[in-house]
Design a protein with these regions (language model features):
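Non-catalytic cap/lid and distal C-terminal segments of serine-dependent acyl enzymes
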Residues: 19-266
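Sec/Tat signal peptide C-region and signal peptidase I cleavage site
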Residues: 14-18
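Bacterial N-terminal signal peptides
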Residues: 5-13
Length: 266
């Protein structure tokens, strides 16, 4: 009930207040086909506490999801349930192209789509993160959040570039994509890596069939093999559709993130 009340409060606040996000200028990328739209929301204390540094939360599909994330973090911070964060919205005009790591050839999905995920991570690592660090007071703790195919990129980053982000929030990640390359690579990573100091949140709604089976197999592998430094939290929302799992899981995702940050001294 508390989560529902908090979510309604956040959504109401978003509805009556203008967005806190501002667009920032970024040079034409040399790494991706089309430079994403970048928006930034600064914490309430940013201008008054001029010596404080902040963790950064990169929200994929930032135009659609940035206000929800920023509002929830603000509400949690007021009740000592979250650190303040710089929120960076990252919005692609072609999600499948930029977020899916591999090209899909399965006729049950969009054939021929995807394949740009690695280039998009290159963009984040080599162009966007350095720019954010230069423009704003950051503390080198970075989090990435995404839903569906954007959640797939979050999981891909978790296993392929484990030091790029210290926190990963994946809401209904599309780990069924293609030939399930990201699924298999992630299973292998958690089963063989000796040290994973990170935070991983995943959830799923009422998705069924193979989508649910694939997701469950990943959760089981992570729980079976995770080491003590990997802080995980998984949720199932049986009465929520795929489209609403980010809204449903965000409170728990951010609470778990705060616990992890407290544990490691962020």
């Amino acid at each position: 009930m508390r989560i529902v009340f908090l979510l309604l409060s956040v959504l109401f606040s978003i509805g009556i207040n203008a967005s806190n996000f501002l667009s920032i200028k970024i040079a034409q990328s040399t790494l991706v086909e089309e430079t994403p739209k970048i928006t930034v929301a600064l914490p309430a204390s940013y201008k008054t506490n001029i010596t404080k540094t902040y963790p950064v939360l990169f929200v994929l599909d930032g135009v659609a999801n940035g206000d929800l994330v920023n509002g929830m973090i603000h509400r949690l911070h007021l009740s000592n349930g979250s650190n303040e964060h710089i929120i960076v919205g990252v919005t692609s005009s072609n999600r499948l192209r930029d977020f899916a790591p591999t090209v899909n050839n399965d006729p049950r999905g969009p054939v021929g789509e995807g394949g740009g995920g690695e280039k998009f991570l290159d963009f984040l690592e080599s162009e966007l993160i350095p720019l954010i660090n230069k423009k704003f007071r950051t503390n080198n703790y970075n989090v990435i959040a995404g839903h569906s195919v954007a959640g797939l990129l979050v999981i891909h980053s978790f296993q392929s570039r484990p030091n790029l982000f210290q926190g990963h929030l994946a809401f209904s990640p599309a780990v069924w994509w293609g030939e399930r390359e990201t699924l298999q690579a992630t299973k292998e990573y958690v089963a063989t890596a000796k040290h994973i100091q990170n935070y991983l949140y995943m959830d799923i709604g009422n998705e069924g069939g193979e989508m649910r089976q694939v997701y469950d197999s990943l959760v089981q592998t992570i729980l079976r093999h995770r080491n003590i430094d990997l802080h995980v939290r998984f949720d199932e929302f049986e009465h929520e559709t795929h489209d609403f799992t980010m809204a449903a899981g965000l409170y728990n995702a951010l609470k778990g993130l705060f616990q992890h940050q407290q544990k490691i001294g962020v």
